[in-house]
Curated annotation (Swiss-Prot):
It comes from Malacoplasma penetrans (strain HF-2). It is an enzyme of class 2 (transferase). Homodimer. Probably interacts with PlsY. This is Phosphate acyltransferase. The keyword Lipid metabolism applies. GO terms for biological process: fatty acid biosynthetic process; phospholipid biosynthetic process. The lineage of its organism: Bacteria, Bacillati, Mycoplasmatota, Mycoplasmoidales, Mycoplasmoidaceae. Pathway: Lipid metabolism; phospholipid metabolism. The gene is plsX.
């Protein structure tokens, strides 16, 4: 397996990405990594024992860039890393750069699988009992129709079954209530369609209060609502953790409680730490594209490389292509 990794344009030092790539290759002898970025800066960080290929990129997409302005940045590290996958010189791509630009360029360069109306941005979130849940879409599309939501359910179900090895994954649509008449017209229409799809384990609407309670394995939403829900969860977790840590500033009993709670606090922190399960797939593309956090460190790059490896190994793209070819055959 060959992966192209964009090591530029994110908020951390490039050594975080390079060190993660080095250690990942040591533990995965069947993986080769192409580092894409400023050759001079990369060479300062690599060791003589490293077996990396370097593709020089003279440009860098900044976090402040917008998708329209980067069309002509064909010499940027992000563009070149994605292009390597299109040219079949790599099996998948990973970047921690500007999210909106990355999603735009993957659409532009790699294209969609025939039959798929919209691609979606899908992360993984840990849940109470450790099973976890995927969330599609969380920002690639501000607006969706019923067909898009149905396709998200189909793609996400296949991904969870083939990559996460969850049999017969449960699927739900994020909504303001569980009754069939709740939500906007496209929610109601998608709900009706999915109830009749035999190869999807659809359980109906899911309210946001149950996102982390393992009622489903896949939450389906348009990207606008999905992004708000995801960021609300992230913010809530940080606030609760900060509040718990704040008890140590209180009198003796506060300190005593804090000291006794340290093991439990660490367990909770490790369980819900997104760094352990970093990386989101742009699902629906002709190739594998993974995006990690803009402030990614060693841990996040490493876990994102693991996701990239597992997705490529599962032969996900060919499975999705075969699934959506059936739609064309039926027309």
């Amino acid at each position: 397996m060959i992966f192209s990794v964009d090591v530029m344009g994110f908020e951390n030092d490039i050594r975080e990405a390079i060190n993660a790539c080095r250690d990942f290759c040591k533990k995965n002898s069947d993986v080769k990594i192409i580092l894409v970025g400023d050759k001079e800066r990369i060479q300062k960080e690599i060791k003589s024992s490293d077996n990396f290929e370097i593709v020089h990129a003279s440009e860098e997409i900044k976090m402040t860039d917008d998708p329209i302005s980067i069309r002509k940045k064909t010499n940027s590290s992000m563009y070149k890393a994605i292009e390597l996958v299109k040219e079949n010189k790599a099996d998948g791509v990973l970047s921690a750069g500007n999210t909106s630009c990355y999603v735009f360029l993957t659409f532009l360069i790699l294209g969609k699988i025939p039959g798929i109306t919209k691609c979606g941005f899908m992360p993984y979130m840990p849940t109470i009992n450790g099973r976890g849940v995927n969330f599609l879409d969380v920002g690639a599309n501000k607006e969706c129709d019923a067909t898009d939501l149905v396709n998200f359910a189909r793609m996400g179900s296949i991904y969870i079954e083939k990559v996460r090895n969850v049999k017969n994954p449960k699927v739900g649509i994020l909504n303001i209530g569980t009754e069939d008449n709740k939500g906007l017209s496209y929610h109601i229409e998608a709900n009706k369609i999915l109830k009749d799809v035999k190869n999807i384990n659809y359980v109906g609407f899911v309210e946001s209060r149950y996102l982390l309670e393992e009622k489903v394995d896949l939450i389906v939403s348009d990207g606008f609502v999905g992004n708000i829900a995801l960021k609300a969860l992230e913010g809530t977790f940080k606030t609760v953790l900060r509040s718990l840590l704040g008890t140590r500033k209180k009198p003796l009993f506060g300190w005593l409680w804090f000291l006794l709670s340290i093991p439990n606090l660490l367990t909770i922190k490790n369980k819900y730490d997104y760094k352990n399960n970093a990386g989101a797939i742009v699902l629906g593309l002709n190739k594998i594209a993974i995006k990690t956090h803009g402030s990614a460190d060693y841990k996040q790059f490493y876990s994102s490389l693991r996701l990239l490896r597992d997705t490529v190994k599962a032969d996900l793209i060919n499975i999705l292509k075969r699934e959506f070819e059936k739609d064309n055959e039926g027309q």
